[in-house]
Amino acid sequence: MSTTNYPLLERVNDPADLRRLPRAELKALATELRAFVLESVSKTGGHLSSNLGTVELTVALHAVFDTPRDRLVWDVGHQTYPHKILTGRRDRMPSLRQLGGLSGFPQRAESEYDTFGTAHSSTSISAALGMALAAKQRGDERRCVAIIGDGAMTAGMAFEALNNAGVADANLLVILNDNDMSISPPVGALNRYLAQLMSGQFYAKARDVGKSVLKNAPPLLELAKRLEQQAKGMVVPATLFEKFGFNYIGPIDGHDLDSLIPTLENIRGLKGPQFLHVVTKKGQGYKLAEADPVAYHGPGKFDPRVGLVKPATPPKQTFTQVFGQWLCDMAEKDERLVGITPAMREGSGMVEFHQRFPERYYDVGIAEQHAVTFAAGMACEGAKPVVAIYSTFLQRAYDQLIHDVALQNLPVVFALDRAGLVGADGATHAGAYDIAFVRCIPNMSMACPADERECRQLLTTAYEQDHPVAVRYPRGAGVGVAPLPDLEGLPFGKGEVRRKGRRMAILAFGTLLYPALQAAEALDATVVNMRWAKPLDTQLLLQVAAEHDALVTVEEGCIMGGAGSAVAEALAAAGVQRPLLQLGLPDAFIEHGDPAKLLALQGLDAAGMQRSITERFGALPGEQALAAA
């Protein structure tokens, strides 16, 4: 991407270059940086609103702090495109979130300026505190800064870190990037507190009174300090963060470099834990994103002159949409149903449910642990909770899943979106481990629908059970198998034979059924749609094993401990010996890229399956070559 239109930005190859610029030019640099972010994301897709909102803050941080010696830890990290551009990766932005290209999140392996890898929320304060105390032990005076959003601040982990940091005597700066907008609208008492603090007549009046108090203060140092604290107390009544032991500064305008830079310079010289409250606006500087920051949170490619345009041909229904429609239909049928989400209303397909059944919709904020135990409590009182959560985020509530739900055998349905590889978001968001970590829990079951129709049917089956059940389904469009309008389920724990072949049987779990069927045509193999990773349809498995010379399992999840392992365990328990090939995700983190290309690289497309099977078991008589897609 050409930098011809960005003359100042072209001169900044690292933060040292930025610090050499005259302060008077930093505003112009921020303007160029914002335009560069917009142009870049419009060509590659990615996170936009959050990055447009952190431009000035990023410029100010690199202008004031001696990065990378001073540590910047970005919470979540999807707002770090300006940071990447200023830290030597400007010319690689066209590769953003593409196979072999820049990650959309901070990665330690990508740059020394990415001091801590992030993508899940609310980890920054803990990490920055650890860095600060490690530096203190070595006698190093470096500064450590955590930048965290108001949505991420609602998570319990953030408060655990604040509680520790307030008494740790570390040179830690926590910057609250208060933009009143996580992916879904932020909820909870903390966000209400921040909103009240920043809105209405009280803040304006208190600010004016504070200025008046300071203006009229006698020129006595101690009295002036006392009055300053009183004035600050009037602006920020009983400041929550000061109760944690932090020196609270703010709120200040996060888009005003004339405020940001001197404030950060003053803070840099202070000892102990500091808390800076910065107010920003998501989508700042691009009117379309300012008006609809959710739509521009993570857009695909678009023309910035006209904005997002709906495709002329409606795309295939997504699994997320299938879930959202099922949730509304089941809620109409059963008034006991309640829907729970940890701050992912839009991403989990719950917008319509929220609109139609607001009294039965619960957004608990970025609080996965609380969401799961909250669901358990509701189930104890006769409600029928459905927890809509990304597979990767359920990892954060594993103890609650075991201790609070499964141990008590409570009928909670977990709708696990983003199961398997997720493409551009990469390893941090991959739902690679859910089969393995769910199936080992007593009382838990795990369904793996192969398409949109089965997704709706298996959600119904899960809902009808009197114990906890997880239903996993991938991100994005289905295969085009339209769901049936009724709410009929499928038999619990039962699979089906989809294709009869000879010698060899492929046992497919989830959406890899369809490439398995393609591969089977060339191999003349039997294909079984297993549907359930737990309970395994052992009767069908043993029948298929008796009729075939070799077995293959395919799953879009980790091989270790996954569905293939369940098949191996069942065969061993029955004393059945059959050659078994397990295909799935390896013991490695799969980085970002196009989902189809990533599956092909792992040998999980039709051609890859045929290749792996042939290499293991040899060519079959009359086998046809399967052309790679």
Curated annotation (Swiss-Prot):
Q: Which Gene3D superfamilies match?
A: 3.40.50.920, 3.40.50.970
Q: Which GO terms describe its cellular component?
A: cytosol
Q: Does the keyword Plastid apply?
A: no
Give the matching Pfam families. Answer: DXP_synthase_N, Transket_pyr, Transketolase_C
Q: Which InterPro entries match?
A: Dxylulose-5-P_synthase (IPR005477), THDP-binding (IPR029061), Transketo_C/PFOR_II (IPR009014), Transketolase-like_Pyr-bd (IPR005475), Transketolase_BS (IPR020826), Transketolase_C (IPR033248), Transketolase_CS (IPR049557)
Broad class of enzyme this protein falls into: transferase
Query: What Enzyme Commission number does this protein have?
Result: 2.2.1.7
Q: Name one GO biological process term.
A: thiamine biosynthetic process
Which residues bind Mg(2+) per the record?
D150, N179
Q: Which UniProt keywords apply?
A: Isoprene biosynthesis, Magnesium, Metal-binding, Thiamine biosynthesis, Thiamine pyrophosphate, Transferase
Describe which pathway this protein belongs to, using the record's wording: Metabolic intermediate biosynthesis; 1-deoxy-D-xylulose 5-phosphate biosynthesis; 1-deoxy-D-xylulose 5-phosphate from D-glyceraldehyde 3-phosphate and pyruvate: step 1/1
Cofactor annotation: Mg(2+); thiamine diphosphate
Keyword Transferase, does the record have it?
Answer: yes
Q: Where does thiamine diphosphate bind?
A: H78, A119, H120, S121, G151, A152, N179, Y286, E368
Identify the SMART domains for this entry.
Answer: Transket_pyr
PROSITE patterns membership: TRANSKETOLASE_1 (PS00801), TRANSKETOLASE_2 (PS00802)
Q: Give the highest taxon in the source lineage.
A: Bacteria
Q: How is the cofactor bound?
A: Binds 1 Mg(2+) ion per subunit. Binds 1 thiamine pyrophosphate per subunit.
- Gene Ontology molecular-function annotations: 1-deoxy-D-xylulose-5-phosphate synthase activity; magnesium ion binding; thiamine pyrophosphate binding
Catalytic reaction equation(s) = D-glyceraldehyde 3-phosphate + pyruvate + H(+) = 1-deoxy-D-xylulose 5-phosphate + CO2
Q: What does this protein do?
A: Catalyzes the acyloin condensation reaction between C atoms 2 and 3 of pyruvate and glyceraldehyde 3-phosphate to yield 1-deoxy-D-xylulose-5-phosphate (DXP).
Family in the record: Belongs to the transketolase family. DXPS subfamily.
Give the record's subunit note. Homodimer.
List the protein's name.
1-deoxy-D-xylulose-5-phosphate synthase
Look up and give the organism this protein is from.
Acidovorax ebreus (strain TPSY)
Q: Which gene encodes it?
A: dxs
